[in-house]
């Protein structure tokens, strides 16, 4: 094992268990920092050990409450830079605000993915590490190097182990996810591919209209980058079962699971939802028998190690 003494890992409050698991994989202790609130609710941060000339990694997904977690990340980066860290890498397992990545037609709306990226760069973070960005082009919003790594090796290994490839078909829940679904299907012995054509009348409401592909008597594996209210997912499962699917499972990286998501999943025809721990599960989600969680700790720890010691990251992760 290479000398790790110049590598320090700090964490905000958004996902402490993941940060601790990453530290365990790296064989380093968690950096000492106070991350709390003043009496008026403002973020209070104090770095409680020397970071001078150290390679520092800050682990903080910007999941709900998104504004608070983003602010924690920004203040942590600022505190570390002012404490003379040699470099600070923002490790953002789930990059919040990423779904607002463009203006639709003539809508008078912000591009909040760009806003969040600019804020992180303004704090002079030296690098960003994230997992499965909602859209690859978000990388262009950052003015610093960014490594967007993929959870697909972890998910693929679990699909092989749990379901194999016999009688299996990979399903994209919408037209926009076809590239991701095709990549997964290719690595599952060129499994068949189906596409769900959905029409969304308004945000977080989806209506499944048509299925392109033959799912009769097959195990359907839905793949996507995130699940929010699970409305689309549950409607897709119902449509697939209606078309004769034997089993419907979903492999999704980021378990946002807001609002009625857990109830929707419990009451759906979905057989299993497999997610990662880029976002911590709520108490309700942890007790849901249909939800199973895999850990990205080993993937992120290996990536952090490679960044810290100047090794290739792209050779490790395959889209």
From Swiss-Prot:
Cofactor binding remark = Binds 2 Mg(2+) ions per subunit.
List positions binding Mg(2+) 1. 134
Mention one GO molecular function. Answer: kinase activity
PROSITE patterns, per the entry: PRPP_SYNTHASE
- Pathway note: Metabolic intermediate biosynthesis; 5-phospho-alpha-D-ribose 1-diphosphate biosynthesis; 5-phospho-alpha-D-ribose 1-diphosphate from D-ribose 5-phosphate (route I): step 1/1
Residues folding into a coiled coil are none
Where is the protein found, in the record's own terms?
Cytoplasm
Q: Which GO BP terms apply?
A: 5-phosphoribose 1-diphosphate biosynthetic process; purine nucleotide biosynthetic process; ribonucleoside monophosphate biosynthetic process
A single Gene Ontology CC term: ribose phosphate diphosphokinase complex
Cite the binding residues for ATP. Answer: 40-42, 99-100
State the SUPFAM superfamilies in the record: PRTase-like
Catalysed reactions, semicolon-separated: D-ribose 5-phosphate + ATP = 5-phospho-alpha-D-ribose 1-diphosphate + AMP + H(+)
Q: What is its main location?
A: cytoplasm
The UniProt entry annotates the active site at 198
Swiss-Prot/TrEMBL keywords = ATP-binding, Cytoplasm, Kinase, Magnesium, Metal-binding, Nucleotide biosynthesis, Nucleotide-binding, Transferase
Q: Which EC class does it fall in?
A: transferase
> What are the binding positions for Mg(2+) 2 in this chain?
174
Q: Which cofactor does it need?
A: Mg(2+)
Q: Where does D-ribose 5-phosphate bind?
A: 200, 224, 228-232
Q: Which domain of life is it from?
A: Bacteria
Question: By its UniProt entry, which Pfam families does this protein fall under?
Answer: Pribosyl_synth (PF14572), Pribosyltran_N (PF13793)
Assembly and partners are described as: Homohexamer.
Function field? Involved in the biosynthesis of the central metabolite phospho-alpha-D-ribosyl-1-pyrophosphate (PRPP) via the transfer of pyrophosphoryl group from ATP to 1-hydroxyl of ribose-5-phosphate (Rib-5-P).
What is the name of this protein?
Ribose-phosphate pyrophosphokinase
The gene designation is: prs
